[in-house]
Regions:
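Catalytic, metal-anchored helix/loop core of enzyme active sites in primary metabolism
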Residues: 1-378
């Protein structure tokens, strides 16, 4: 079980809930990082008294350093600070809850030190899954997923001695706020509309990804990397209730599912305590009152991001980094009111069509593909 964490992305939704679980389990915090939220990170730092606090934005880091003077907490900035936080000797687990490809280098740094990775940053595996998984094997680092779907699959696979016994993975998807709408009906949807997720409380970027179904597309790629399966063996299924978090179908016809309330503290707690389970203070799922559980096929004509993700996964190389970088840039423009909802898949598809894919890429190739894809969208 985890004793001390370094938390990358402390002020986001996953980061805040991770600190709740850490407090509940008596887990120490060695490092906290964020992008630029000075007020909240100061509050968290004073409460958990980490050795290190990092703000990616240099100006914000200077302000935080002044506020924390006299506390004994070291303050760093930028990628250098993230790498330092991920590499702290006293942290046995690094929780990667930062958004986007910025989490890639710190995750690799933690892996190279053989730490447990509680992985909530799906972009790391989407962009550089083979590099990350090969490094984890080389350095003996354990990766425990925090995404509810991948945590569910991870739990269903406990006791599976041979991955060839798996016929397919079924990742469940709520369908988001626009379930049942046509592509034409989605044309005029605003950021405010997209941010009304029916079941989960998340940050704005992942909530928009859930509305476009890109989140599920990225999770398909993540599952391929985590479990070393071809894209054909990872599928998405609409499950509006968000009670069944994912399923694994085995070659003998058995189908295992993990069920629970839609609460991110469940997979966070599991990642912290694995291979054990800790008592939860929250009420468990009541099967007698949760109602009917339904399943449906996703509509890829209305939500083409799911198709684009599968196509990028099939191409391989830097295609997934292009997909991810273009999507992050397009979602950012949508949240600023500069793009329409359906322009997100249009811009992503344009980047995939126009950019050259590098096969067997280095880390530098992957990061450059990500940067170039963002530029192509702007």
């Amino acid at each position: 079980m985890t004793k001390t964490i370094a938390l990358l992305g402390a002020t986001g939704s996953i980061g805040r809930q991770t600190l709740e679980v850490a407090r509940e389990l008596g887990i120490s915090v060695a490092a906290l990082t964020a992008h630029r939220q000075v007020d909240l990170l100061e509050q968290q730092a004073r409460q958990f008294m980490p050795r290190l606090a990092v703000l990616y934005d240099p100006d914000a880091a200077r302000e935080l350093e002044g506020r924390l003077r006299g506390t004994g907490i070291e303050v760093l900035a930028g990628e250098e600070g993230l790498l330092a936080a991920a590499s702290l000797d006293e942290a046995d687990t690094v929780v990667t809850a930062v958004m986007g490809s910025v989490g890639l280098r710190p995750t690799l740094a933690a892996i190279e030190r053989g730490k447990r990775i509680a992985l909530a940053n799906k972009e790391t595996l989407v962009c550089a899954g083979e590099l990350v998984m090969d490094a984890a094997e080389k350095y003996g680092a354990e990766i425990v997923p925090v995404d509810s779907e991948h945590s569910a699959v991870f739990q269903c696979l406990q006791g599976c001695r041979d991955r060839r016994e798996v016929r397919r993975i079924l990742l469940t998807c709520s369908g988001g706020p626009f379930y049942g709408k046509t592509f034409g009906e989605l044309e005029d949807m605003t950021a405010a509309d997209a941010l009304r997720h029916p079941n989960w409380h998340m940050g704005p970027k992942i909530t928009v990804d859930s509305a476009t179904l890109m989140n599920k597309g990225l999770e398909i790629i993540e599952a391929m990397r985590l479990y070393r399966l071809p894209v054909e063996q990872v599928q998405a299924v609409i499950h509006r209730q968000s009670i069944v978090h994912s399923l694994v179908e085995f070659r003998d016809g058995a189908l295992l599912a993990q069920l629970g309330t839609p609460d991110m503290k469940l997979p966070i707690r599991y990642a912290m305590t694995y291979p054990h389970r800790a008592e939860s203070p929250d009420a468990p799922l009541d099967l007698l009152t949760c109602g009917a559980l339904t399943f449906d096929r996703p509509d890829e004509e209305a939500f083409p991001c799911l198709r684009l993700a599968r196509e990028a996964a099939a191409v391989g190389g830097t295609a997934c980094a292009i997909l991810n970088g273009a999507n992050e840039a397009a979602v950012g423009l949508f949240l600023q009111g500069k793009l329409g909802f359906n322009d997100i898949p249009r811009r992503v598809e344009r980047a995939l069509e126009r950019m050259e894919v590098q096969y067997q890429p280095s880390l530098a190739d992957i990061l450059e593909a990500d940067r170039a894809a963002r530029r192509a969208v702007l």
